[in-house]
């Protein structure tokens, strides 16, 4: 008798954050439970969901929000929830490691096991998104995690703009890519709206690597007081799930709380990926220029 194909149901959550950790974690748990009720096996919560996106301003006091990875209370709570529901949950958090700080995600398997840590590699620095003040560049490299339901790759927000990150995870066998995110308006330019660009870039990653992709973003207006006045970002949501050709299979708007769900046949996608030939026809020997910042070392 032929084995059944491997089906996986993924979910992206979207909600507005308050500046109260317990309230936000409770909201995340409520939506994880809602996603589970819809049949989800792997559930993505947005980036740094424990509070406001504090990186709008450079304030020493915000370092107090960081906590060590071992025994982190929100991770422990999500471990218990994952075990109870039998779901996989990537958990984004502000990590303190001695005198270093990282924008990190812990991957919790369906039995509550912590499978390991990814630290954000690409750290942005611009008006409203001053992450270099808070976070060291990640040192884990791009990784994949074998969960109960699928081998997954997880990267964080600004990482999603770099095709090299998606390809690195896909080359290691990632069957689904996940990107927790916090992105919205640009404080220095009211006319700049990146939401469509943001979505299309990741749809391209899905299509180029022939893997589904899940992106979860927050919504709502957040105001941070600074010494120069208030900084304000309206987060645009637009969370989505893309299929293996980059097609949009589920999408949220820019204001509403959402639980997006989609099912994929991993074995069918694997056959499509192999048949399409993009991994067969790769030429790593010609890509050494990618190891330089300015393209000055092309293959001769």
Swiss-Prot record:
Its EC number is 3.5.1.53. GO terms for molecular function: N-carbamoylputrescine amidase activity. It comes from the Eukaryota. SUPFAM superfamilies: Carbon-nitrogen hydrolase. Pathway: Amine and polyamine biosynthesis; putrescine biosynthesis via agmatine pathway; putrescine from N-carbamoylputrescine (amidase route): step 1/1. Keywords: Hydrolase, Polyamine biosynthesis. It catalyses: N-carbamoylputrescine + H2O + 2 H(+) = putrescine + NH4(+) + CO2. The active site is at residues 47, 120, 157. Residues 8-266 form the CN hydrolase domain. GO terms for biological process: putrescine biosynthetic process from arginine. Gene3D superfamilies: Carbon-nitrogen hydrolase (3.60.110.10). PROSITE patterns: CN_HYDROLASE. Pfam families: CN_hydrolase. Homooctamer. PANTHER family: BETA-UREIDOPROPIONASE, NITRILASE C965.09-RELATED. Involved in polyamine biosynthesis. Belongs to the carbon-nitrogen hydrolase superfamily. This is N-carbamoylputrescine amidase. It comes from Solanum lycopersicum. The gene is CPA.
């Amino acid at each position: 008798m032929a084995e059944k194909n491997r089906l996986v149901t993924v979910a992206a959550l979207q909600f507005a954050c308050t500046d109260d950790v317990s309230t936000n974690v409770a909201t995340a748990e409520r939506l994880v439970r809602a996603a589970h009720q819809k049949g989800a096996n792997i559930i993505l919560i947005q980036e740094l969901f424990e509070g406001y996106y504090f990186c709008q301003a450079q304030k020493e006091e915000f370092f107090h929000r960081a906590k060590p990875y071992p025994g982190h209370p929100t991770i422990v709570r999500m471990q218990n929830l994952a075990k109870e529901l039998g779901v996989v949950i990537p958990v984004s958090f502000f990590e303190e490691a001695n005198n270093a700080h990282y924008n990190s995600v812990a991957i919790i398997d369906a039995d509550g096991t912590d499978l390991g840590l990814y630290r954000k590699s690409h750290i942005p620095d611009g008006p409203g998104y001053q992450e270099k003040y808070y976070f060291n560049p990640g040192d884990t490299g791009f990784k994949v995690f074998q969960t109960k339901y699928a081998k997954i790759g997880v990267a964080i927000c600004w990482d999603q703009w770099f095709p090299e990150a998606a390809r690195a995870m896909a080359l290691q066998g990632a069957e689904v890519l996940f990107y927790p995110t916090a992105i919205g308006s640009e404080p220095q330019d009211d006319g700049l709206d990146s939401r469509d660009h943001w979505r299309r870039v990741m749809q391209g990653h899905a299509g180029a690597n022939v893997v589904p992709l899940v992106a979860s973003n927050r919504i709502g207006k957040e105001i941070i007081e600074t010494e120069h006045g208030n900084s304000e970002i309206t987060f645009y949501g637009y969370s989505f799930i893309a299929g293996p050709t980059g097609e949009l299979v589920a999408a949220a708007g820019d204001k509403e709380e959402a639980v997006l769900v989609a099912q994929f046949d991993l074995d069918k996608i694997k056959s499509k990926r192999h048949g399409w030939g993009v991994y067969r026809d790769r030429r790593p020997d010609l890509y050494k220029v990618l190891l330089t910042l300015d393209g000055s070392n092309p293959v001769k």
